[in-house]
């Protein structure tokens, strides 16, 4: 579900219980006692890793494997994204998200465009405006076009606890109350 203002207070635990764990419950109803090969992309991969760790603590063995693409579990070196992760930047972002209850997908896409300015801004601009060429679609443009909104509380907690404080890698992150 793509969140709306009504989902402002949806938490990371909600994403885990209503997303990952509910999906596993549904799968196990169709194919009982079968282990699932989980795949997560970007924040979905991080959520899957958190779910797998929480499940391991509860001796829940429904996951056979976990595969993550473009996902982080250690945020100590977030690369170019660190430009956007500081207490001041997060305060500004929180104020922006608070108004609508979500971070709009175009705002998230804009951050990624700023990280890949040559591929996503300059090269297409030069080709289109200066050379009069039509640029083809590339994988980065497709990925940015397939955006989702981020619920205020979930995204705020994600940025503070994982990016700013690195609570997951340092063993301080609490998932599903444990």
Question: Residue spans of the language-model regions?
Answer:
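Gly/Ala-rich beta-loop-alpha elbow adjacent to hydrolase catalytic centers
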Residues: 40-44, 48
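Predominant activation on well-ordered alpha-helical scaffold segments within soluble catalytic domains
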Residues: 21, 49, 156-160
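C-terminal subdomain of alpha/beta-hydrolase-fold enzymes, centered on the catalytic histidine
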Residues: 141-178
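Alpha/beta-hydrolase active-site loop
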Residues: 9-30
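Short, surface-exposed "cap/lid" segments of acyl-processing enzymes
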Residues: 1-6
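Alpha/beta-hydrolase-fold enzymes
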Residues: 29, 33, 47, 51-155
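Conserved catalytic-core motifs of eukaryotic protein kinase domains, centered on the activation segment
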Residues: 7-10, 79
């Amino acid at each position: 579900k793509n969140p709306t203002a009504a989902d402002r207070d949806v938490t990371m635990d909600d994403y885990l219980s209503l997303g990952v764990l509910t999906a596993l419950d549904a799968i196990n109803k169709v194919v009982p006692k079968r282990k699932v090969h989980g795949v997560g992309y970007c924040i979905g991969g991080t959520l899957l890793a958190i779910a797998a760790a929480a499940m391991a603590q509860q001796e829940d063995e429904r996951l056979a494997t976990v595969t993550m693409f473009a996902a982080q579990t250690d945020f100590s070196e977030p690369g170019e994204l660190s430009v956007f992760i500081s207490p001041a930047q997060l305060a500004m972002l929180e104020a922006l998200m608070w108004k609508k209850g979500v971070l709009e997908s175009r705002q998230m896409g804009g951050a990624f465009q700023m990280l890949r300015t040559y591929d996503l801004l300059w090269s297409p601009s030069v080709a289109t405006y200066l050379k009069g060429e039509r640029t083809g679609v590339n994988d980065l443009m497709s990925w940015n076009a397939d955006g989702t909104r981020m619920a205020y509380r979930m995204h705020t907690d994600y940025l503070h606890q994982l990016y700013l404080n690195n609570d997951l890698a340092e063993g301080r992150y609490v998932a599903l109350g444990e």
